[in-house]
Amino acid sequence: ELPANRGRILDRNGLILASSVPAASIWAIPEDVDQDKPEVRAKLKELARLMGMPLAELQRKLADEDKTFVWIRRQLDWDIGQQIAALDIPGIYQRKEYKRQYPEGESAAHVVGFTNVEDKGQEGMELAFNDLLAGRAGSRRVIKDRMGRVVEGVGEVVPPMDGRDMQLSIDSKVQFFAYQKLRDQVIAHKAKA
């Protein structure tokens, strides 16, 4: 599967309320990670550090050698993914995905909504217009070796169709000030709802 880039959500002035950035998701074939080798153990320690994960948690995820696939960490920053790829640990792989960013944060969250780790809309405009924003994933048929490397392409490549951008009628600056005033009053009056 070739992932499509989700469309952006913009305010009426074209300022970005939601956009997608490349992210690296790390996965493993536990039986292919030889934790008995000192050089692999050293690389796993560095992998855990790069991901901000305790080494014990990483080792636990890799302990079940009966599993043929396990996610280690989803949607890491792309540059961290490149550092992980440079470690070249046998049995550890990565997949390019997209991660949503919301520059306006809480001030527009109730309108914009959010997506889950699978990049599907869960609330707000992200949910209501999921089909428009999501686009369509592409595909290509390939033959892979046991290490997950592409050996040969077979058949045609269907390119992904990126999602469409959506422009809202709200003004993010006005929204920000209204949100601030509302938040200040909630705090001042110790409101619970």
Regions found by a protein language model. Give the residues of each.
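Small/polar-residue-rich segments within soluble enzyme cores
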Residues: 18-23, 28, 42-49, 60-164
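Short, conserved charged micro-motifs
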Residues: 34-42
